[in-house]
Every structure is written in structure tokens, then in C-alpha cells.
Amino acid sequence: MARRGMKFGIFLAPFHRLGENPTLAMARDLELIEWLDWLGYDEAWIGEHHSAGWEVIASPELAIAQAAERTRNIMLGSGVTSLPYHHPFLVAQRFVQLDHMTRGRVMLGCGPGALPSDAYMLGIEPVHLRRRMEESLDAIIRLLRCDERVTMSTDWFEMREAKLHLAPYSDPRFHIAVASTITPFGMVAAGRHGLGVLSIGAGLPGGPEAMASQWKIAEDTAAQHGATMNRKDWRIVVGMHIAEDDEKALRQVKAGERHETTSYFEETLGRVPGTSDDPVRDGVKALTTVVGSPETAIRVIERLSAASGGGFGGVLFRAHEWATREQTMKSYELFARYVMPYFQGAAAPLIESAAWVRENRRRVMSNNVEAVRRAFTDTGRSVPDEMKYRTVGAQDVEPAADD
């Protein structure tokens, strides 16, 4: 189906609770991407982490390479590549190779690195991460143009007359997006080059209210650098779980969400515990979480779009295992069946067609009743009583006597 309107996908860190078999956890991640591809989701962004136990994928490139062989249409991105941890020439080379191997289905997500413990083990002071990311991103953008030999020298990498010997498969290059939280850094980095944005901060307290002002930072920065921002390349990342009704969805995720938040974010990463007695329900009200029925999901996404001050191009669901495997897979199916068509326009022509036939039924269908009647009477047979009432259009036509 040709894509119109909003795009949907997942932001797959991934999150897997401690004590589980990590081999099976990664297998489930790939299974999920296959399922999303079959359901018609647009994108899957896969994370890079190196410590703290829960987020087990160290190389999104390796996961993308395997997922590409098991899927047909879904776009596959790094969500995100921690640029300060890698030489920019090698990042550019790897993603150009993936661009060819996937025939244009790869995307590069960029960030400074999410876990301080990763940077600590690599001997990088957190205060240098954002500067390093900017330097790396500048180098990658120049390399991907393939129109010059790039010489750069920083305190952590050097390039001497560097030029990619393999140009991107995509024209002019694959899509690049920058992760943005509640600080202005990500929007500034994206604005400097006119890149896409992954607003992870939309799922944090205070995030939705700040979205419009954050986007303005990107637009203002782009104008200063002769670039242009496009809202179609802006994706909002939120938690999601869908069931047949709101209370069922809330029940299914309550224990799993509490375990993830308490065990990982509070006890392991040191985030200050929240004060809400029902954080998921309150998150739905605050637009930081989409948990409920398909109808609730539509309302929350529409409110998020309004809060953004002009709309955005897509919604990514922060993949989690708050519910059981079966409930989680069903959640993605329900969203694909009942929410995606609303925002992508797939259901509108069908609804309009049904409404037109309903409104014009007497005029359009009445001749069919006569045609069916004559199919019997013209051969000298009586019209069966059942046909007089079951024929399409019979509701609006008085039964006629047989000729």
C-alpha cells in the first residue's frame, strides 16, 4: 500500500529483564521486527548499548543486517548509533554498505550515547560526548556527499584526505536522524544539517508541552546554517500498549511497567522514583504514554500532534515487554488494524464508499431487485419467497407480483 500521512514504527532499545536468556531475547526482537513488517509498519530503529544489563544489543548494524534478510518492506535504522564511540569514517562506511545490502532500507540514527556507564568504560568524560557527536556528524555528512577528500583533526579522531570509495545506494544518501531528549542539543544538531529528529523526550514528563518550542529551536538553527527542517522527518517516541478496551490494556501492563521502571531506571540507573500511584494511567493523561483501546490511541496521538504546534511525521513506540508475549504481539496488530488506517488514509475511501452507497441505496439498488425478479420470471419460474427478501436492495422496494 502506498504510504500517505503519518508513519509508525518502533524504537527498539531493546529492554529485556534480568535473568532471561539473552540469546532468546534477541531472537524475540528479530521476530518482532518480522511481525511488524508483515503488519505494514514503516520503521524499526534498533539501539546500541554496552552496559547495565537490560539493553542487550551492542551493534545495531549487525541486527539490521539480519533483520533485512527476514523482512521485505520495513525501513531499518540505528536507534541510535553513539557517535562518540566510533571513528566517523567507519560509521559512514558501515552504513553505506548496509544501504547497498538492504537496497535502500537503512537509516542512520545519531546520538551522543545514552548510558553514562558506557562512556565510563570507554574512558570518555560525559562532558565531551556532545562535542564529539557534533564533530563526528559533521565528518559523516561531508563524507556522504562523496564530492571531496576530507581532512579533519580533533582530539579524538583524525582523517587525512578521506573519501568513501563506495557511494550510498540511496540518492543522494540514506535518511539520517538525530535523537533529541528534553535538552535543546539534539534539535540544534539536527538543525545544523537539516536532518530528521527522533524526539525521545516526548515520552518524558514535561516532554509534550516542550515539543513546539523544541522544534522551533531546530528551525531557527537550520535557518542560521542555510538548511531546512521538514516536519515529515520528525518522529515522536512514546510507550504504547493496545488492547480491546482501556482497562484491559492498563491491567496487562501494570506489573511489567512497574518492574522495568523500578529495577532498571530507578535501582540500576539511579533515576529519582516518581510520586504517582498509577504512573501508566497518569502517563496517558499527560500524553507521555499510549495505553488503552484503539480509540484512546487515536485521541492521544491527535493531542500530541496538536501539542507539537504543526504536526509531525511519525510515531515510534518504545518497544518493551510490559505485557506477555502474546498480548504484546496482539497490541501491535490492533494498532495496525484500527489506528494506522485512520492516520494514513487507508480506511477513508472505504468509509466514504460505504456512506455513499448507504445514502443512495434506494436509487442505486432498486433496479437490482427487478433484474433478479426477471431472471426467474423470464424463464417461466416463480421468484422464491426467500429471494424476494434477501436480494440486495429489497429493503427499499415493495415486493412485486410474479409476471
Regions found by a protein language model. Give the residues of each.
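Conserved, mostly hydrophobic/aromatic
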Residues: 8, 36, 40, 48, ...
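Active-site mouth loops of central-metabolism enzymes
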Residues: 12-27, 81-89, 170-182, 243, ...
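Hydrophobic faces of well-ordered beta-strands that scaffold small-molecule active sites
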Residues: 8-12, 44-46, 76-78, 106-110, ...
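N-terminal beta1-alpha1-beta2 module of alpha/beta enzyme domains
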Residues: 1-76, 173-174, 354-356, 369, ...
